[in-house]
Amino acid sequence: MLSQHTQARIEQLAATLGLYIYDIDFFKEDNRPILRVSITRKAPMQKQDCKNGLAVSLQDCQNVSELISPLLDVEDENLKDYNLEVSSPGLERVLKKPQHYIYSLGEKVSIKLMDKSVIEGILHDVNENVSISIDTGKEILSFSFADMKKIKVVFEL
């Protein structure tokens, strides 16, 4: 796990390139520690109208990797023998944090509920502490965060 200080420094460095940190995950895959940093050109709290033409490029990922790698090697003693991956959050990204929900307002989402049912609709509204609302095309439904097991953006052509 990264310290709050290190995460803040990563966010500052990405901002110098006009990029934002969407998420930072630390996990093991095939017994290898991986630090995955997801970046975007859009600030996490910006609304739907800021999406056009803001795709992350391979060059953006490389630039962020080159900026933060020395920082991680020096500042965070908890990281030893890890692999750094920098990428976009993807088209069908999982929404985990309140800012992810706000970032995805107006997009089609799939919600897997605790009872294992799945509902799709347009993410309509977010109350950061309590619930979200989606427009299914027939009605607007609200769900508490406690009722949701997983929510992700659904890519459509």
UniProtKB/Swiss-Prot annotation:
Pfam families: DUF150_C, RimP_N. The keyword Amino-acid biosynthesis does not apply. It comes from the Bacteria. This is Ribosome maturation factor RimP. Belongs to the RimP family. Gene3D superfamilies: RimP-like superfamily, N-terminal. PANTHER family: RIBOSOME MATURATION FACTOR RIMP. The gene is rimP. InterPro entries: Ribosome_maturation_RimP, RimP_C, RimP_C_sf, RimP_N, RimP_N_sf. Keywords: Cytoplasm, Ribosome biogenesis. HAMAP family: RimP. One of its GO terms (cellular component) is cytosol. Required for maturation of 30S ribosomal subunits. One of its GO terms (biological process) is ribosomal small subunit assembly. It comes from Helicobacter hepaticus (strain ATCC 51449 / 3B1). It is found in: Cytoplasm.
